[in-house]
């Protein structure tokens, strides 16, 4: 397959105008069963393509899934979050930035048991807000999360307080909050917390 490295573990297919038909073929191909990193950023993927991907029986070894700059909506995200048919149980890195996702579906993603292995989550450049931040703060599923990207979102001081009061905050090594709604109060919350003890990059 075009883009497949010789070790068959990395497949880069960004910017190829792929949509549902191509994803259907990809998800069914036995050639991808060793792929650990799949980059489908900047394509034409919508909710149907997401469902096909998330239920693929060939991508069981996938650990990193890049879906930034596509057309995934709340419907598709909520379906994946609540699905009992998803086969992608080992995703450690998930990039969803710059899709059509709102605070509602992002909060459901965070609460879902389907993403309990996540170490890195990029949900920037969308409509993540306090509901998402509060869900992260209350989460007992994202216990491996070390990197969280929330660039250009709508989290304010109240939301960041809820996020860093939670158990997950203590594990975070990277937290990107550039261009949110934090204001002076939010900055004070971050500066005054002992909870971000492992943070290396802010």
Predicted regions and their residues:
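Solenoidal tandem-repeat scaffolds enriched in leucines and small polar residues
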Residues: 92-157
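Concave beta-strand-loop units of leucine-rich repeat
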Residues: 12-18, 39-44, 66-71, 84, ...
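Asparagine/serine/threonine-enriched low-complexity, disordered tracts
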Residues: 43, 70, 90-92, 134, ...
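Leucine-rich repeat
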Residues: 3-10, 31-37, 57-64, 85-93, ...
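LRR N-terminal entry segment and analogous cap-like coil->beta motifs
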Residues: 1-50, 68-74
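Hydrophobic anchor residues at the C-terminal helix/turn of individual leucine-rich repeat
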Residues: 26-29, 53-56, 80, 85, ...
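Short, solvent-exposed loop/turn at the beta-strand->alpha-helix junction
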Residues: 17-24, 44-51, 71-78, 100-107, ...
